[in-house]
Amino acid sequence: NDSAWASATGDYAGIVNLVSVLRGGAASTSPAKKFFKYMRPFRWSRKDASLAKVTILPSLTTMEKADPSNDGGYPSGHTNAAYLAAIAMAYSVPEQYSELMLRASELGYDRIVAGMHSCLDVIGGRMTSTAIAASNLYDGNNADAKKAAVQSGQKLTGNDSTVEEKSDYDAYQKDKDTYFYRMTYNLKEDSADTTKAVSVPKGAEALLESRYPYMDDTQIRYVLYSTAISSGYSVLDDAEGWGRLNLFEASNGY
């Protein structure tokens, strides 16, 4: 229900609609959670006293499900939703692409701090959302929705200098490092497996087509290729290549 978080009418309706398009259909992580049945971190610590104790934030204790068999954590649904919304907004307002990716990563990080998810859960949520977003943006049936979203974004930014004035370019290196950390969470890298070739998934170029309207698909794919992180990190070496795509860096060029 779009009205729950934003108006589906008015100047920015195109952006609201694109968020709904990306979050619609098969965008939920619930089926994956039911398949993997991977416990949330606070349940692990209760089960094994040798593990670090994880406590849920008091304000979230009411969200704990009584039945642990129906409360999987992998992949994180909140992280998935955050990235889907952020990618839709970034597509609409590409001038703020990297900033929106950073904000999505922050929500995933907050889920870890809250005690509701492990680093692995959050990484899975990012990967899932990236694949889902690309699929929906690549779908020709959504061409009108994408066009309307970009037009709404142009109304939002206009021809003034607001975007430039609000962008903290001095923090770029710090933000880039933060985003990379939240891609990997310093999980152990297999030193013997760091030379795998980058695989850019089919349709991934759609993620950045509004950011680089002057590039063709091949050129955008090379941007994704040249900014992908190295292989060897836990979970990130998926067969298609979604785990290694660094949209923060890719939105800033080769």
Pin down the residues of each PLM region.
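Hydrophobic alpha-helical bundle signature of multipass membrane enzymes
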Residues: 1-113, 145-164, 168-254
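Alpha-helical transmembrane segments that form the membrane-embedded catalytic/substrate-binding core
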Residues: 78-82, 112-142
